[in-house]
Amino acid sequence: MKGLTRLLNSLSRHTASVTCSPSSSSLLISRRSLFISAATHFPVNFSESITTNASRNCSRSSSFPFNWIEQRRTMFIQTQSTPNPSSLMFSPGKPVMEIGSADFPNSRSAMSSPLAKAIFAIDGVVRVFYGSDFVTVTKSDDVTWDILKPDIFAVVMDFYSSGQPLFLDSQATAAKDTAIHEDDSETVAMIKELLETRIRPSVQDDGGDIEYCGFDTETGIVKLRMQGACSGCPSSSVTLKSGIENMLMHYVSEVKGVEQEFDGEEEGTSSGPME
């Protein structure tokens, strides 16, 4: 896990680390053809299905006498594994989120984004996450990536070729959870600054993100929600304890621990006031 490893290396006194060797595969998708890198192996019907879909959307002029001259649109899509085997990062080679990130834990939450909505329409997709230059897709356990990848590649390619906005409401999703307010205590401000500048970039390297949910002033517990590939990841508890918790406790003496919030968990269940 390269993000967590980088986070742990910044604390020389802590030796716990989690490693993951991400592997990537590259696809060069054209409106007329699909080129797959030699390092990636897919079933024979993989290229056929994407080529057919790409060719169907190809804009051609039947009146032009030479059918070998036509407009082509090419996109280079790269995939990268994450610490969560059920999540995969798709990098379209261009910015996705200009500011912040966006998490879609279900299809209902994706109604405001045409791309996320289209990805959720693929059978087997259970979560979508937007990062700065990648889209993380999480699948259910009963489907394989060999089946899902062709459809996801086609959806991403069609979206960026269409020119549609990422969000229908045209409002950028900024990282508001770590925005420092005037009424924030010095402790909360320090926690937010560390999350935004030191921890969040490392977590995003692994295809996920974190959301600040509050700080319990009585117990010293920081509440965080894991997003994207980090949500449901087998290594998420290690990320919290060995990486995030150690760093927050090292720089902010008031922090005594970190606990994870889960989707759908009721607010206000903590024993003390949350800031």
From Swiss-Prot:
GO terms for cellular component: mitochondrion; nucleus. Pfam families: Nfu_N, NifU. Its main location: mitochondrion. The keyword Nuclease does not apply. SMART domains: Nfu_N. GO terms for molecular function: ATP binding; copper ion binding; iron ion binding; iron-sulfur cluster binding; structural molecule activity. GO terms for biological process: iron-sulfur cluster assembly. The keyword Mitochondrion applies. Keywords: Mitochondrion, Transit peptide. Residues 1-61 form a transit peptide. It is found in: Mitochondrion. Belongs to the NifU family. This is NifU-like protein 5, mitochondrial. It comes from Arabidopsis thaliana (Mouse-ear cress).
